[in-house]
Amino acid sequence: MDSFKVVLEGPAPWGFRLQGGKDFNVPLSISRLTPGGKAAQAGVAVGDWVLNIDGENAGSLTHIEAQNKIRACGERLSLGLSRAQPVQSKPQKALTPPADPPRYTFAPSASLNKTARPFGAPPPTDSTLRQNGQLLRQPVPDASKQRLMEDTEDWRPRPGTGQSRSFRILAHLTGTEFMQDPDEEFMKKSSQVPRTEAPAPASTIPQESWPGPTTPSPTSRPPWAVDPAFAERYAPDKTSTVLTRHSQPATPTPLQNRTSIVQAAAGGGTGGGSNNGKTPVCHQCHKIIRGRYLVALGHAYHPEEFVCSQCGKVLEEGGFFEEKGAIFCPSCYDVRYAPNCAKCKKKITGEIMHALKMTWHVHCFTCAACKTPIRNRAFYMEEGAPYCERDYEKMFGTKCRGCDFKIDAGDRFLEALGFSWHDTCFVCAICQINLEGKTFYSKKDKPLCKSHAFSHV
Protein backbone atom coordinates (compact mmCIF):
# COMPACT_ATOMS: atom_id res chain seq x y z
CA MET A 1 0.00 0.00 0.00
CA ASP A 2 1.24 3.50 -0.87
CA SER A 3 0.22 6.12 1.71
CA PHE A 4 0.29 9.84 0.93
CA LYS A 5 -1.22 13.10 2.12
CA VAL A 6 -3.32 15.57 0.12
CA VAL A 7 -4.13 19.15 1.19
CA LEU A 8 -7.03 20.89 -0.60
CA GLU A 9 -7.51 24.63 -0.38
CA GLY A 10 -11.08 25.82 0.20
CA PRO A 11 -13.79 26.73 -0.11
CA ALA A 12 -16.03 23.75 -0.91
CA PRO A 13 -16.97 21.89 -3.07
CA TRP A 14 -13.93 19.63 -2.79
CA GLY A 15 -14.75 17.57 -5.91
CA PHE A 16 -15.15 14.03 -4.50
CA ARG A 17 -17.68 11.72 -2.86
CA LEU A 18 -17.14 9.15 -0.13
CA GLN A 19 -18.40 5.62 0.30
CA GLY A 20 -18.26 3.20 3.22
CA GLY A 21 -17.76 3.97 6.89
CA LYS A 22 -17.81 2.28 10.26
CA ASP A 23 -21.61 1.87 10.09
CA PHE A 24 -21.23 -0.06 6.80
CA ASN A 25 -18.28 -2.17 8.04
CA VAL A 26 -16.38 -0.94 4.98
CA PRO A 27 -13.34 1.39 5.08
CA LEU A 28 -13.94 4.91 3.84
CA SER A 29 -12.85 5.36 0.23
CA ILE A 30 -13.27 7.73 -2.71
CA SER A 31 -16.26 6.66 -4.83
CA ARG A 32 -16.50 9.49 -7.37
CA LEU A 33 -14.49 12.47 -8.60
CA THR A 34 -15.68 15.63 -10.29
CA PRO A 35 -13.75 16.02 -13.58
CA GLY A 36 -11.40 18.99 -13.20
CA GLY A 37 -12.27 19.37 -9.50
CA LYS A 38 -9.89 20.14 -6.68
CA ALA A 39 -9.48 16.51 -5.67
CA ALA A 40 -8.80 15.37 -9.23
CA GLN A 41 -6.21 18.11 -9.72
CA ALA A 42 -4.48 17.08 -6.49
CA GLY A 43 -3.96 13.52 -7.76
CA VAL A 44 -6.76 11.78 -5.85
CA ALA A 45 -8.07 8.68 -7.65
CA VAL A 46 -11.29 6.67 -7.39
CA GLY A 47 -10.80 3.78 -4.98
CA ASP A 48 -8.23 5.48 -2.71
CA TRP A 49 -8.74 4.59 0.97
CA VAL A 50 -9.18 7.46 3.42
CA LEU A 51 -6.88 6.93 6.43
CA ASN A 52 -7.45 10.21 8.27
CA ILE A 53 -9.35 13.47 7.91
CA ASP A 54 -7.58 16.52 9.35
CA GLY A 55 -5.47 14.24 11.54
CA GLU A 56 -8.40 12.21 12.92
CA ASN A 57 -8.38 8.46 12.24
CA ALA A 58 -11.06 7.72 9.62
CA GLY A 59 -11.41 4.08 10.68
CA SER A 60 -13.55 5.05 13.68
CA LEU A 61 -15.86 7.40 11.76
CA THR A 62 -19.26 6.57 10.34
CA HIS A 63 -20.25 7.79 6.90
CA ILE A 64 -22.18 10.79 8.25
CA GLU A 65 -19.44 11.67 10.74
CA ALA A 66 -16.88 11.70 7.94
CA GLN A 67 -19.09 14.00 5.86
CA ASN A 68 -19.58 16.37 8.80
CA LYS A 69 -15.86 16.33 9.46
CA ILE A 70 -15.18 17.37 5.87
CA ARG A 71 -17.86 20.10 5.98
CA ALA A 72 -16.33 21.52 9.16
CA CYS A 73 -12.89 21.91 7.59
CA GLY A 74 -13.67 25.36 6.17
CA GLU A 75 -10.89 26.74 4.01
CA ARG A 76 -8.40 23.86 4.27
CA LEU A 77 -8.94 20.09 4.03
CA SER A 78 -6.17 17.61 4.83
CA LEU A 79 -6.64 13.97 3.82
CA GLY A 80 -4.43 10.97 4.45
CA LEU A 81 -4.94 8.47 1.62
CA SER A 82 -3.70 5.02 0.73
CA ARG A 83 -3.51 3.54 -2.73
CA ALA A 84 -3.00 -0.11 -3.60
CA GLN A 85 -0.01 -0.90 -5.77
CA PRO A 86 -0.86 -2.60 -9.10
CA VAL A 87 -0.02 -6.28 -9.15
CA GLN A 88 2.79 -7.00 -11.58
CA SER A 89 2.85 -10.29 -13.31
CA LYS A 90 5.95 -12.42 -12.97
CA PRO A 91 8.25 -12.36 -16.00
CA GLN A 92 7.93 -15.45 -18.07
CA LYS A 93 10.95 -17.39 -19.16
CA ALA A 94 11.64 -17.28 -22.85
CA LEU A 95 11.25 -20.57 -24.62
CA THR A 96 14.50 -21.51 -26.37
CA PRO A 97 14.71 -24.21 -29.00
CA PRO A 98 16.78 -27.31 -28.16
CA ALA A 99 20.49 -27.14 -28.96
CA ASP A 100 20.34 -30.01 -31.44
CA PRO A 101 16.89 -30.29 -33.06
CA PRO A 102 16.03 -33.68 -34.57
CA ARG A 103 16.53 -34.04 -38.28
CA TYR A 104 14.49 -36.20 -40.58
CA THR A 105 15.36 -37.48 -44.03
CA PHE A 106 12.99 -39.34 -46.33
CA ALA A 107 13.67 -41.21 -49.54
CA PRO A 108 12.86 -39.01 -52.58
CA SER A 109 10.40 -41.48 -54.10
CA ALA A 110 8.75 -42.57 -50.85
CA SER A 111 5.15 -41.54 -50.23
CA LEU A 112 3.20 -41.80 -47.03
CA ASN A 113 0.72 -44.66 -46.92
CA LYS A 114 1.16 -45.66 -50.55
CA THR A 115 -1.12 -48.65 -50.06
CA ALA A 116 -3.88 -48.85 -47.50
CA ARG A 117 -3.45 -51.28 -44.63
CA PRO A 118 -6.45 -52.92 -43.00
CA PHE A 119 -6.80 -52.30 -39.29
CA GLY A 120 -6.44 -56.02 -38.45
CA ALA A 121 -3.41 -56.76 -40.65
CA PRO A 122 -0.34 -58.16 -38.83
CA PRO A 123 2.56 -55.67 -38.64
CA PRO A 124 5.93 -56.38 -40.29
CA THR A 125 8.57 -58.12 -38.24
CA ASP A 126 11.02 -55.23 -38.37
CA SER A 127 11.08 -51.56 -39.27
CA THR A 128 13.49 -49.56 -41.45
CA LEU A 129 14.68 -46.08 -40.54
CA ARG A 130 16.87 -43.66 -42.46
CA GLN A 131 19.18 -41.41 -40.49
CA ASN A 132 21.92 -39.18 -41.96
CA GLY A 133 21.74 -41.01 -45.29
CA GLN A 134 22.19 -44.55 -43.78
CA LEU A 135 19.64 -47.33 -43.51
CA LEU A 136 19.14 -48.71 -40.00
CA ARG A 137 17.13 -51.84 -39.37
CA GLN A 138 15.66 -52.30 -35.94
CA PRO A 139 13.86 -55.52 -35.07
CA VAL A 140 10.48 -55.26 -33.40
CA PRO A 141 10.29 -57.88 -30.64
CA ASP A 142 6.53 -57.83 -30.22
CA ALA A 143 3.72 -57.29 -32.73
CA SER A 144 1.58 -55.55 -30.09
CA LYS A 145 4.25 -52.87 -29.63
CA GLN A 146 4.32 -52.22 -33.37
CA ARG A 147 0.54 -51.95 -33.36
CA LEU A 148 0.75 -49.50 -30.46
CA MET A 149 3.22 -47.39 -32.43
CA GLU A 150 0.83 -47.27 -35.38
CA ASP A 151 -2.16 -46.41 -33.23
CA THR A 152 -0.32 -43.60 -31.48
CA GLU A 153 0.87 -42.09 -34.74
CA ASP A 154 -2.03 -39.66 -34.67
CA TRP A 155 -0.92 -38.37 -31.25
CA ARG A 156 2.38 -36.97 -32.47
CA PRO A 157 2.59 -33.18 -32.92
CA ARG A 158 2.32 -32.17 -36.54
CA PRO A 159 1.89 -28.92 -38.51
CA GLY A 160 -1.56 -27.35 -38.69
CA THR A 161 -1.95 -28.53 -42.30
CA GLY A 162 -0.90 -32.16 -41.61
CA GLN A 163 -3.20 -35.13 -42.08
CA SER A 164 -3.55 -38.01 -39.65
CA ARG A 165 -2.91 -41.63 -40.57
CA SER A 166 -6.61 -42.48 -40.39
CA PHE A 167 -7.40 -39.59 -42.73
CA ARG A 168 -4.84 -40.81 -45.27
CA ILE A 169 -6.33 -44.33 -45.11
CA LEU A 170 -9.73 -42.81 -45.81
CA ALA A 171 -8.26 -40.84 -48.73
CA HIS A 172 -7.00 -44.09 -50.26
CA LEU A 173 -10.38 -45.76 -49.87
CA THR A 174 -12.17 -42.83 -51.49
CA GLY A 175 -9.67 -42.55 -54.35
CA THR A 176 -8.28 -39.12 -53.42
CA GLU A 177 -4.77 -40.22 -52.43
CA PHE A 178 -3.31 -38.64 -55.58
CA MET A 179 -3.79 -35.22 -54.00
CA GLN A 180 -0.62 -33.64 -52.63
CA ASP A 181 -0.10 -34.16 -48.89
CA PRO A 182 0.84 -30.84 -47.24
CA ASP A 183 2.38 -32.73 -44.31
CA GLU A 184 4.78 -34.59 -46.59
CA GLU A 185 5.78 -31.40 -48.41
CA PHE A 186 6.32 -29.60 -45.11
CA MET A 187 8.54 -32.39 -43.75
CA LYS A 188 10.57 -32.50 -46.98
CA LYS A 189 11.27 -28.76 -46.85
CA SER A 190 12.10 -28.64 -43.14
CA SER A 191 14.47 -31.65 -43.28
CA GLN A 192 16.75 -30.57 -46.13
CA VAL A 193 20.36 -30.95 -44.84
CA PRO A 194 23.68 -31.12 -46.74
CA ARG A 195 24.81 -34.67 -47.44
CA THR A 196 28.46 -35.79 -47.62
CA GLU A 197 27.81 -38.77 -49.86
CA ALA A 198 26.63 -38.66 -53.43
CA PRO A 199 22.87 -39.06 -53.60
CA ALA A 200 21.30 -41.73 -55.71
CA PRO A 201 20.06 -40.57 -59.13
CA ALA A 202 16.43 -39.58 -58.93
CA SER A 203 14.04 -37.60 -61.06
CA THR A 204 13.73 -33.92 -60.25
CA ILE A 205 10.32 -32.98 -58.90
CA PRO A 206 9.48 -29.26 -58.94
CA GLN A 207 8.29 -28.09 -55.54
CA GLU A 208 5.51 -25.63 -55.19
CA SER A 209 6.13 -22.57 -53.06
CA TRP A 210 3.79 -22.52 -50.13
CA PRO A 211 2.56 -19.04 -49.20
CA GLY A 212 3.68 -17.83 -45.81
CA PRO A 213 1.27 -17.46 -42.97
CA THR A 214 -0.86 -14.38 -43.35
CA THR A 215 -1.58 -12.15 -40.43
CA PRO A 216 -5.32 -12.10 -39.80
CA SER A 217 -6.84 -8.69 -40.04
CA PRO A 218 -7.95 -7.37 -36.64
CA THR A 219 -11.66 -7.59 -36.08
CA SER A 220 -13.51 -4.38 -35.44
CA ARG A 221 -13.84 -3.76 -31.77
CA PRO A 222 -17.19 -2.80 -30.27
CA PRO A 223 -17.81 0.94 -29.80
CA TRP A 224 -17.92 0.70 -25.99
CA ALA A 225 -14.33 -0.68 -26.09
CA VAL A 226 -12.96 1.86 -28.59
CA ASP A 227 -14.73 5.03 -27.41
CA PRO A 228 -14.17 5.76 -23.68
CA ALA A 229 -17.06 8.26 -23.69
CA PHE A 230 -19.55 5.79 -25.18
CA ALA A 231 -21.41 5.19 -21.91
CA GLU A 232 -21.62 8.91 -21.11
CA ARG A 233 -22.83 9.76 -24.60
CA TYR A 234 -25.72 7.32 -24.51
CA ALA A 235 -26.90 7.94 -20.95
CA PRO A 236 -30.72 7.69 -20.53
CA ASP A 237 -31.23 11.45 -20.14
CA LYS A 238 -29.13 12.48 -23.13
CA THR A 239 -29.87 12.76 -26.84
CA SER A 240 -27.30 11.90 -29.47
CA THR A 241 -26.83 12.85 -33.10
CA VAL A 242 -25.61 11.03 -36.22
CA LEU A 243 -23.44 12.57 -38.94
CA THR A 244 -23.67 11.26 -42.51
CA ARG A 245 -22.52 12.52 -45.89
CA HIS A 246 -24.63 13.13 -48.96
CA SER A 247 -24.15 10.63 -51.80
CA GLN A 248 -21.01 11.25 -53.86
CA PRO A 249 -21.29 11.26 -57.66
CA ALA A 250 -19.99 8.28 -59.62
CA THR A 251 -17.62 8.73 -62.55
CA PRO A 252 -17.99 6.98 -65.93
CA THR A 253 -14.98 5.01 -67.20
CA PRO A 254 -13.59 6.30 -70.54
CA LEU A 255 -12.10 3.67 -72.90
CA GLN A 256 -9.77 4.47 -75.79
CA ASN A 257 -10.29 3.38 -79.39
CA ARG A 258 -9.39 -0.27 -80.04
CA THR A 259 -8.45 -1.34 -83.59
CA SER A 260 -9.82 -4.86 -83.12
CA ILE A 261 -13.21 -3.52 -82.12
CA VAL A 262 -13.34 -1.11 -85.05
CA GLN A 263 -12.36 -3.87 -87.47
CA ALA A 264 -14.94 -6.23 -85.99
CA ALA A 265 -17.61 -3.58 -86.33
CA ALA A 266 -16.58 -2.70 -89.88
CA GLY A 267 -16.30 -6.35 -90.93
CA GLY A 268 -20.06 -6.73 -90.88
CA GLY A 269 -21.90 -9.95 -90.25
CA THR A 270 -23.80 -8.68 -87.18
CA GLY A 271 -26.64 -6.25 -87.01
CA GLY A 272 -26.12 -2.66 -86.04
CA GLY A 273 -28.01 -3.03 -82.77
CA SER A 274 -26.59 -6.37 -81.63
CA ASN A 275 -23.88 -6.77 -78.98
CA ASN A 276 -21.89 -10.01 -79.07
CA GLY A 277 -19.66 -9.10 -76.11
CA LYS A 278 -16.77 -7.80 -78.26
CA THR A 279 -18.23 -4.88 -80.18
CA PRO A 280 -19.46 -1.99 -78.00
CA VAL A 281 -22.96 -0.79 -78.75
CA CYS A 282 -24.29 2.51 -77.38
CA HIS A 283 -27.00 1.92 -74.80
CA GLN A 284 -28.73 5.19 -75.75
CA CYS A 285 -28.87 5.13 -79.57
CA HIS A 286 -28.27 1.35 -79.99
CA LYS A 287 -25.58 1.92 -82.63
CA ILE A 288 -22.11 0.40 -82.87
CA ILE A 289 -19.46 2.65 -81.35
CA ARG A 290 -16.48 3.30 -83.66
CA GLY A 291 -14.13 5.30 -81.43
CA ARG A 292 -14.00 6.54 -77.87
CA TYR A 293 -16.81 5.49 -75.59
CA LEU A 294 -17.78 5.53 -71.92
CA VAL A 295 -18.76 2.66 -69.65
CA ALA A 296 -21.23 3.43 -66.86
CA LEU A 297 -23.74 1.28 -64.97
CA GLY A 298 -22.65 -1.75 -67.01
CA HIS A 299 -23.42 -0.16 -70.40
CA ALA A 300 -21.40 1.57 -73.12
CA TYR A 301 -22.24 5.08 -74.37
CA HIS A 302 -21.07 7.55 -76.97
CA PRO A 303 -19.52 10.41 -74.96
CA GLU A 304 -22.06 12.87 -76.38
CA GLU A 305 -24.98 10.49 -75.64
CA PHE A 306 -24.28 10.17 -71.90
CA VAL A 307 -26.24 13.22 -70.68
CA CYS A 308 -28.32 14.31 -67.68
CA SER A 309 -31.95 13.28 -68.05
CA GLN A 310 -33.13 16.65 -66.68
CA CYS A 311 -30.86 19.42 -68.03
CA GLY A 312 -29.23 17.52 -70.92
CA LYS A 313 -25.67 18.29 -69.79
CA VAL A 314 -22.94 15.95 -71.07
CA LEU A 315 -21.67 13.91 -68.12
CA GLU A 316 -18.29 12.83 -69.47
CA GLU A 317 -16.63 14.69 -66.59
CA GLY A 318 -17.86 15.80 -63.18
CA GLY A 319 -19.61 12.61 -62.12
CA PHE A 320 -23.26 11.58 -62.14
CA PHE A 321 -26.03 10.10 -59.99
CA GLU A 322 -28.43 7.28 -60.85
CA GLU A 323 -31.92 7.34 -59.33
CA LYS A 324 -34.78 5.03 -60.38
CA GLY A 325 -33.11 4.27 -63.72
CA ALA A 326 -32.53 7.94 -64.61
CA ILE A 327 -29.13 9.67 -64.76
CA PHE A 328 -28.62 13.13 -63.23
CA CYS A 329 -25.76 15.58 -62.95
CA PRO A 330 -24.77 16.54 -59.36
CA SER A 331 -26.57 19.90 -59.44
CA CYS A 332 -29.87 18.47 -60.72
CA TYR A 333 -29.69 15.57 -58.28
CA ASP A 334 -29.19 17.92 -55.33
CA VAL A 335 -32.15 20.08 -56.36
CA ARG A 336 -34.40 17.08 -56.84
CA TYR A 337 -33.37 14.56 -54.18
CA ALA A 338 -31.14 16.25 -51.56
CA PRO A 339 -32.83 16.63 -48.13
CA ASN A 340 -33.85 20.03 -46.74
CA CYS A 341 -32.43 21.56 -43.57
CA ALA A 342 -35.01 21.81 -40.77
CA LYS A 343 -33.76 25.30 -39.83
CA CYS A 344 -32.84 27.19 -43.01
CA LYS A 345 -35.00 25.05 -45.38
CA LYS A 346 -32.14 24.86 -47.90
CA LYS A 347 -30.82 21.77 -49.64
CA ILE A 348 -28.07 19.85 -47.81
CA THR A 349 -25.28 18.83 -50.18
CA GLY A 350 -22.44 18.11 -47.74
CA GLU A 351 -22.49 16.66 -44.24
CA ILE A 352 -25.96 15.91 -42.91
CA MET A 353 -26.86 16.12 -39.22
CA HIS A 354 -29.60 13.71 -38.10
CA ALA A 355 -31.21 14.82 -34.84
CA LEU A 356 -34.75 14.93 -33.40
CA LYS A 357 -35.97 12.88 -36.40
CA MET A 358 -34.98 15.72 -38.76
CA THR A 359 -32.03 16.65 -40.98
CA TRP A 360 -29.86 19.74 -40.46
CA HIS A 361 -26.82 21.51 -41.78
CA VAL A 362 -23.94 21.04 -39.35
CA HIS A 363 -23.67 24.82 -38.86
CA CYS A 364 -27.43 25.11 -38.29
CA PHE A 365 -27.71 22.64 -35.39
CA THR A 366 -25.95 24.57 -32.60
CA CYS A 367 -26.16 25.02 -28.84
CA ALA A 368 -28.76 27.64 -27.88
CA ALA A 369 -26.34 29.19 -25.36
CA CYS A 370 -22.82 29.17 -26.85
CA LYS A 371 -23.86 28.79 -30.53
CA THR A 372 -21.25 26.06 -31.05
CA PRO A 373 -22.14 23.27 -33.53
CA ILE A 374 -23.07 20.18 -31.55
CA ARG A 375 -21.99 17.79 -34.32
CA ASN A 376 -21.67 14.18 -33.12
CA ARG A 377 -21.92 14.88 -29.38
CA ALA A 378 -24.63 14.39 -26.80
CA PHE A 379 -26.96 17.27 -26.01
CA TYR A 380 -29.92 18.16 -23.78
CA MET A 381 -33.29 19.62 -24.76
CA GLU A 382 -34.75 22.38 -22.58
CA GLU A 383 -37.84 24.37 -23.61
CA GLY A 384 -37.50 23.09 -27.19
CA ALA A 385 -33.89 24.24 -27.64
CA PRO A 386 -30.74 22.07 -27.70
CA TYR A 387 -27.91 22.70 -25.22
CA CYS A 388 -24.45 21.19 -25.02
CA GLU A 389 -23.54 19.35 -21.83
CA ARG A 390 -21.39 22.14 -20.42
CA ASP A 391 -23.99 24.90 -20.80
CA TYR A 392 -26.85 22.66 -19.67
CA GLU A 393 -25.12 21.79 -16.40
CA LYS A 394 -24.23 25.44 -15.89
CA MET A 395 -27.76 26.72 -16.51
CA PHE A 396 -30.08 23.88 -15.52
CA GLY A 397 -27.98 21.42 -13.50
CA THR A 398 -29.39 20.26 -10.14
CA LYS A 399 -27.12 20.01 -7.10
CA CYS A 400 -27.71 18.23 -3.82
CA ARG A 401 -28.31 20.60 -0.89
CA GLY A 402 -26.55 18.23 1.48
CA CYS A 403 -23.26 17.35 -0.29
CA ASP A 404 -23.22 20.09 -2.97
CA PHE A 405 -22.61 17.47 -5.69
CA LYS A 406 -24.57 17.24 -8.94
CA ILE A 407 -27.47 14.80 -8.98
CA ASP A 408 -26.63 12.57 -11.93
CA ALA A 409 -29.01 10.57 -14.05
CA GLY A 410 -30.04 7.42 -12.21
CA ASP A 411 -29.31 8.82 -8.72
CA ARG A 412 -32.10 8.53 -6.16
CA PHE A 413 -33.11 11.95 -4.87
CA LEU A 414 -35.97 13.77 -3.17
CA GLU A 415 -37.19 17.35 -2.94
CA ALA A 416 -37.78 19.00 0.42
CA LEU A 417 -37.54 22.51 1.90
CA GLY A 418 -37.38 23.89 -1.62
CA PHE A 419 -34.16 22.02 -2.46
CA SER A 420 -33.09 18.71 -4.01
CA TRP A 421 -31.28 16.10 -1.92
CA HIS A 422 -29.65 12.73 -2.47
CA ASP A 423 -31.64 10.12 -0.59
CA THR A 424 -28.61 9.48 1.66
CA CYS A 425 -27.97 13.20 2.28
CA PHE A 426 -31.41 14.11 3.66
CA VAL A 427 -30.59 13.55 7.35
CA CYS A 428 -31.15 15.29 10.66
CA ALA A 429 -28.72 18.18 11.09
CA ILE A 430 -27.92 17.08 14.66
CA CYS A 431 -28.09 13.28 14.98
CA GLN A 432 -27.62 12.47 11.26
CA ILE A 433 -30.51 9.98 11.18
CA ASN A 434 -31.96 9.46 7.72
CA LEU A 435 -35.30 11.27 7.29
CA GLU A 436 -36.42 9.83 3.95
CA GLY A 437 -40.12 8.97 4.24
CA LYS A 438 -40.28 10.19 7.86
CA THR A 439 -41.80 13.20 9.61
CA PHE A 440 -39.29 15.99 10.01
CA TYR A 441 -39.04 19.60 11.12
CA SER A 442 -37.04 22.43 9.65
CA LYS A 443 -35.08 25.27 11.17
CA LYS A 444 -32.95 27.64 9.09
CA ASP A 445 -33.55 25.44 6.02
CA LYS A 446 -32.07 22.44 7.83
CA PRO A 447 -34.05 19.23 8.45
CA LEU A 448 -34.50 18.00 12.03
CA CYS A 449 -35.98 14.79 13.41
CA LYS A 450 -38.74 14.71 16.07
CA SER A 451 -36.26 14.29 18.91
CA HIS A 452 -34.33 17.43 17.97
CA ALA A 453 -37.20 19.53 16.66
CA PHE A 454 -36.68 22.22 19.32
CA SER A 455 -32.90 21.96 19.58
CA HIS A 456 -30.61 24.87 18.80
CA VAL A 457 -29.03 24.65 15.36
UniProtKB/Swiss-Prot annotation:
CDD domains (UniProt xref): LIM1_Enigma, LIM2_Enigma, LIM3_Enigma, PDZ_PDLIM-like
Main subcellular location of this protein, as a coarse class: cytoplasm
GO MF annotation: an example: metal ion binding
All copies of domain PDZ, residue ranges: 1-85
Keyword Lipid metabolism: no
Alphabetized Pfam families for the sequence: LIM, PDZ
Amino acid composition bias (Polar residues), ranges on this chain: 126-135
Domain LIM zinc-binding: 280-338, 339-398, 399-457
Annotated positions of the Phosphothreonine modification: 96
Modified residues (Phosphoserine): 78, 111, 247
Location of the protein in the cell: Cytoplasm; Cytoplasm, Cytoskeleton
Stored SMART domains: LIM (SM00132), PDZ (SM00228)
Swiss-Prot/TrEMBL keywords: Cytoplasm, Cytoskeleton, Developmental protein, Differentiation, LIM domain, Metal-binding, Methylation, Osteogenesis, Phosphoprotein, Repeat, Zinc
Xref: Gene3D superfamilies: 2.30.42.10, Cysteine Rich Protein (2.10.110.10)
One of the GO BP terms on file: cell differentiation
Asymmetric dimethylarginine: residues bearing it: 103
GO cellular component: adherens junction; cytoplasm; focal adhesion; nucleoplasm; ruffle; stress fiber
InterPro entries listed in its UniProt record: PDZ, PDZ-LIM_domain, PDZ_sf, Znf_LIM
Ranges where the record places region Disordered: 82-166, 186-226
Complex and partners: Specifically binds via its LIM zinc-binding 3 domain (LIM 3) domain to endocytic codes of INSR, but not with those of IGF1R, LDLR, TFRC, or EGFR. Interacts with various PKC isoforms through the LIM zinc-binding domains. Binds to RET in a phosphorylation-independent manner via its LIM zinc-binding domain 2 (LIM 2). Probably part of a complex with SHC and the RET dimer. Interacts with TPM2, TBX4 and TBX5.
Domain notes: The LIM zinc-binding 2 domain (LIM 2) interacts with TBX4. The LIM zinc-binding 3 domain (LIM 3) provides the structural basis for recognition of tyrosine-containing tight turn structures. This domain is necessary and sufficient for interaction with TBX5.
Function summary: May function as a scaffold on which the coordinated assembly of proteins can occur. May play a role as an adapter that, via its PDZ domain, localizes LIM-binding proteins to actin filaments of both skeletal muscle and nonmuscle tissues. Involved in both of the two fundamental mechanisms of bone formation, direct bone formation (e.g. embryonic flat bones mandible and cranium), and endochondral bone formation (e.g. embryonic long bone development). Plays a role during fracture repair. Involved in BMP6 signaling pathway.
Protein name: PDZ and LIM domain protein 7
Upper lineage: Eukaryota, Metazoa, Chordata, Craniata, Vertebrata
